[in-house]
């Protein structure tokens, strides 16, 4: 599955908007309140339409609260009114079919999200469901998953009987896939089941050999951890006593280290758990792909605030890391971190600004953080107080009032220091002007 574009009407802050997507990575940026989460929620409604054709699948709906408000002034009385219909139109590819179109809409406050104009996509899903029932080994199911900002602290309350899921039939790969909050229980249960399988096999054969899919999922987590740390020879195992995932590795000084994943910092824990969840869902959806399941499973993954609790060093590589590990996945993510924005080219960025969606005019890849703040986020790279003093300094310089320019620059140096490149350049400029003026 891949999305090409979405058109939306009357969804939250958007009266009308259209966004097209890169095949691999689309980064949605904007200030807080610009509508980044609204765009991801729109996409979640769209892609989860596929789940309507899968047994046990749960699709996201358009809620009446999602309808855009208009405020009418009636002789001094403000009358807020929801605007209908709310429409989400999508074009994309799925299960070897190109340029499929489907529409979901909500036509009134008391209405339900329509599905009648999504028949082509749900028809493909129903066909896939029949293939699942008949054990078709050639069927490669798309991964669909959404990781919202609640994924770190808000755990999904599991209402299902988890014992009933220990079989992990293929459809279980879609359970809670659209829940913006985290649900690690299913992933941990899968690790537990795979670990017990390997122990059972050891009893039969006398050899301890972990299942191929388990090793593949472990590899995704270990590979990610090594890319963002100085760790070497990393391994992962499920501790049956504590019901936790544990990483063992060599640190940079060669010493052996061992940490449970849930003991790590928020950035490590959040991102490694997310990567593990993606990999485990792939393994459940497409077990016949074996050790190629990470490389060959297609799909759409949505991540709100990809930079959540990440160190800037990992912010710069997280998108390329995800694409390297899961090359057939279309990642649609949001962020306002300069270190994330300058890690991708402008063609993969969509800026949200007062209800408009557009691509940056200038190239973004490799740019310094200050220019990203200034040109993409429309934010000053310095606090307003320092910017005002710098403007005053250059105003005095233009007037050849070097005494006042020196006074203002000295005040700035007291606050910022003398090693800042811009401040050092300003001091050099002032000294040169004084020499030339003598």
Task: Show where each model-derived region lies.
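Amphipathic alpha-helical segments that form well-ordered structural scaffolds
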Residues: 42, 89, 146, 216-227, ...
């Amino acid at each position: 599955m891949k999305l090409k574009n979405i058109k939306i009407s009357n969804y939250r802050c958007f009266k009308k908007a259209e966004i097209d997507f890169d095949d691999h990575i689309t980064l949605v940026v904007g200030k807080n309140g610009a509508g980044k989460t609204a765009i991801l929620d729109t996409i979640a409604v769209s892609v989860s339409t596929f789940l309507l054709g899968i047994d046990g699948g749960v699709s996201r709906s358009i809620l009446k609260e999602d309808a855009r408000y208009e405020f009418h002034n009636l002789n001094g009385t403000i009358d807020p009114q929801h605007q209908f219909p709310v429409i989400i139109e999508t074009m994309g590819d799925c299960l070897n079919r190109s340029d499929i179109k489907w529409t979901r809409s909500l036509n009134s406050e008391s209405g339900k999200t329509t599905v009648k104009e999504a028949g082509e996509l749900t028809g493909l899903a129903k066909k896939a469901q029949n293939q699942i029932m008949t054990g078709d080994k050639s069927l490669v199911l798309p991964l669909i998953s959404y990781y919202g900002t609640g994924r770190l602290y808000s755990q999904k309350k599991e209402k299902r009987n988890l014992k009933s899921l220990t079989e992990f039939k293929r459809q279980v790969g879609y359970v809670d896939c659209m829940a913006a909050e985290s649900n690690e229980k299913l992933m941990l249960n899968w690790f537990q089941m795979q670990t017990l399988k390997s122990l059972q096999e050891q009893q039969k054969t006398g050899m301890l050999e972990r299942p191929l899919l388990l090793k593949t999922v472990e590899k995704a987590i270990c590979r990610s951890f090594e890319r963002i740390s100085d760790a070497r020879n990393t391994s992962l195992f499920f501790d049956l006593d504590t019901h936790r995932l544990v990483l063992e590795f060599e640190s940079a000084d060669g010493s052996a280290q061992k940490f449970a994943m849930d003991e790590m910092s928020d950035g490590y824990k959040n991102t490694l758990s997310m990567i593990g969840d993606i990999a485990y869902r792939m393994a459940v959806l497409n077990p016949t792909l074996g050790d190629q399941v990470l490389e060959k499973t297609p799909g759409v993954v949505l991540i709100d605030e990809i930079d959540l609790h990440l160190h800037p060093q990992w912010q710069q590589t997280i998108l390329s890391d995800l694409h390297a590990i899961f090359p057939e996945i279309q990642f649609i993510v949001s962020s306002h971190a300069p270190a994330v924005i300058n890690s991708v080219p402008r063609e993969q960025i969509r800026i949200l600004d007062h209800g408009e969606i557009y691509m940056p005019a200038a190239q973004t890849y490799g740019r310094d953080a200050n220019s990203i703040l200034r040109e993409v986020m429309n934010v000053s790279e310095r606090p307003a107080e320092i910017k005002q003093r710098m403007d005053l300094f250059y105003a005095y310089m233009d007037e050849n009032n070097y005494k006042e320019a020196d006074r203002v620059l000295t005040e700035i140096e007291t606050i910022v220091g003398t090693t800042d490149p811009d401040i050092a350049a300003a001091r050099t400029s002032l000294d040169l002007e004084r020499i030339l003026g003598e």
